[in-house]
Design a protein with these regions (language model features):
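Non-catalytic, topology-defining segments of multipass membrane proteins
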Residues: 1-168
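Active-site-proximal inter-transmembrane loops
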Residues: 115-123, 177-188
Length: 188
C-alpha cells in the first residue's frame, strides 16, 4: 500500500520493465550473447550484432566477452571440474555462488584469447566488455527523466534482479532436476 501511495506501482513502469526484460534477456542475452556470439548459430550484419550485444549488456550479466568465455568454458567442462557453475558443487554455488566467489567475469587476457579469439579481435566488443554497465546507466537516466523513480525501480532494479535469478535458475535448477533426453555426461 505504501508503494502504491508513493506512485511506485505504476502500470506503465511495469510495462516498461516487461518490454525491457524481453529486449535485454531474450534479444540481448538469448539471441545476442548466447546464440550469436557464443555459438555463432547464425550470421548477421555487424550493426545488428552490435545492437544485440548492447541489448545484452542491459541485463548487467557482464561484458560480452566475459559472458561468452564463461559459457564456452561451461560447454568445454559441462558439470565437471572446470565448469564455472556446476551444480555438483551445490545448488547455491550453481545458482549464485559462482558469481560471488568464483572466477567468472575475472578472466585474464590469455583465457579470453583462448576461449573467445573471435571477439578479442573486435574493437567494439573489447570496448563494450570494459564498460558494459554504461548502456544501463544511460538507460536509467533516460527512464528517470521520462518517467521518474517508478520507472527506474521497475525497469532497472526489479527487472535486473528478476533476470539474474531467471538466468541463475538455468544454471542451477535445470542442471539439478528433470529428465535427461539424451545420453550425456553432464547433468543438463
Amino acid at each position: 500500500m505504501v508503494w502504491r501511495a508513493a506512485g511506485y506501482l505504476a502500470v506503465p513502469a511495469l510495462l516498461a520493465a516487461i518490454l525491457l526484460w524481453w529486449i535485454s534477456a531474450s534479444l540481448g542475452v538469448g539471441v545476442g550473447f548466447h546464440r550469436l556470439l557464443t555459438h555463432r548459430g547464425f550470421k548477421t550484419p555487424k550493426l545488428v550484432e552490435y545492437f544485440l550485444t548492447v541489448c545484452g549488456t542491459l541485463s548487467l550479466e557482464g561484458g560480452p566477452i566475459n559472458w561468452v568465455v564463461t559459457h564456452r568454458i561451461h560447454h568445454a567442462h559441462a558439470d565437471g571440474p572446470g565448469d564455472p557453475h556446476t551444480p555438483r558443487d551445490g545448488g547455491w554455488w550453481a545458482h549464485i555462488g559462482w558469481m560471488l566467489n568464483g572466477t567468472a567475469q575475472k578472466y585474464d587476457r590469455s583465457v579470453m584469447a583462448r576461449y573467445a579469439p573471435d571477439l578479442m579481435k573486435d574493437k567494439f566488443h573489447l570496448w563494450l566488455n570494459r564498460v558494459y554497465w554504461l548502456p544501463l546507466v544511460f538507460l536509467s537516466l533516460a527512464l528517470l527523466a521520462f518517467g521518474g523513480w517508478s520507472y527506474v525501480m521497475w525497469a532497472v532494479f526489479f527487472r535486473v534482479t528478476f533476470n539474474f535469478h531467471a538466468t541463475w535458475l538455468v544454471n542451477s535448477a535445470t542442471h539439478m532436476w528433470g529428465t535427461r533426453r539424451f545420453p550425456t555426461e553432464d547433468d543438463s
